From Swiss-Prot:
It comes from Podospora anserina (strain S / ATCC MYA-4624 / DSM 980 / FGSC 10383) (Pleurage anserina). One of its GO terms (cellular component) is mitochondrion. InterPro entries: Aldolase_TIM, Elp3/MiaA/NifB-like_rSAM, LIAS_N, Lipoyl_synth, rSAM. [4Fe-4S] cluster 1 binds at C140, C145, C151, S388. This is Lipoyl synthase, mitochondrial. Gene3D superfamilies: Aldolase class I. It catalyses: [[Fe-S] cluster scaffold protein carrying a second [4Fe-4S](2+) cluster] + N(6)-octanoyl-L-lysyl-[protein] + 2 oxidized [2Fe-2S]-[ferredoxin] + 2 S-adenosyl-L-methionine + 4 H(+) = [[Fe-S] cluster scaffold protein] + N(6)-[(R)-dihydrolipoyl]-L-lysyl-[protein] + 4 Fe(3+) + 2 hydrogen sulfide + 2 5'-deoxyadenosine + 2 L-methionine + 2 reduced [2Fe-2S]-[ferredoxin].
Amino acid sequence: MASPAPLQRLQAPLRRSLARAAVLSSRTYATIPSPSDPGLTQSSPSPAASTTPAKKAPRPSYFKDTTVASFSEFVGSQSAPLSLSEAYEIKTAEVGPAGRKRTITRLPEWLKTPIPSSGANPNFGKIKADLRGLNLHTVCEEARCPNIGECWGGNDKSAATATIMLMGDTCTRGCRFCSVKTNRKPPPLDPHEPENTAEALARWGLGYVVLTSVDRDDLADGGARHFAETIRRIKQKKPTLLVEALTGDFMGDLDMVKIVAESGLDVYAHNVETVEGLTPYVRDRRATFRQSLKVLEHVKAVRGKEGIITKTSIMLGLGEQEQEIWDTLRELRKIDVDVVTFGQYMRPTKRHLKVEKYVTPDEFDLWKQRALDMGFLYCASGPLVRSSYKAGEAFIENVLRKRAGERAAASASLDQVVAAEETKAL
């Protein structure tokens, strides 16, 4: 019997591999020599390759979930660093089907943040679970804040912060920059919310907390008493916890402002949001620039200039002019507002106001310095800064604790003087 052919003596998988290699080697391919392969020589191109130019090899895909470069990326980059104009260049793109394409503006690199997830940061999931279990809402989620991953992502709960939104998740106003749900008749207030909020904050072991709320124009007091009761419950459970309240304007009712201001809070915040000229186009028609100034001014009248810190926030990128920003800062200093923050307006949905300008980080730094030069106690200014910004909270916490220490020292000194006088009298 004749011996089998050499190929037939091989195992089946190996036979298939050799057969596939033989077929592939019989085909003609255009090859592009690589500089890294010195032994590779370019063969004569096939007729098909001579008429069609070889396409440039695409850059490899690369994904990174943080905006901060690692050390190896920093020292190993083969490309030259971008110039300032290149770094701040606003890019556009054409989207849509053929014949109906439209140009859109890409989000600048300095506004991009990693998408938060419970898998990447377990603490994010823990805080979210606590909030759901106690039926609490946060402005971080409702207003789609870009800093939610940073603020909720501390190494432990004491390093994390969350801005609790009281009185539900539905607002009676419809500001053109805000993505919070609106309705003329929101659900009634949750009577357990003050206790649940205090319980959650005591459980986290925070040193500083921010409370805010939707506007509730459907309530006789605008929710002022509910706000004040929540603050009192928090102070009962943890007297050392510093509380910041970011309130609405209570439709200009200064008696309601007084109720919240006297509830034991440490920082009273109310946002003017934008310059006076743009207020009618940006905010709900029931909110006015002058009404907001009266709220902030009345807080100082109730608690005294040194008795409480007042704070406000301004969005940039809505079409405001430089002189209008100057005028706004001067108005705020007239009524002794202590803290101001600047942040980039970012359009939450297509139904909201368009972004007129993406303000560069350098411009934000400039406005921070200008605000400090005007006498503001503190200014947080940056593209991703929001009114309840984590870095700003740390600074204000230090100021408040320093003031408390000074008051305690002054009180102790006064007690010593009184005791000395009483001793002399004896």
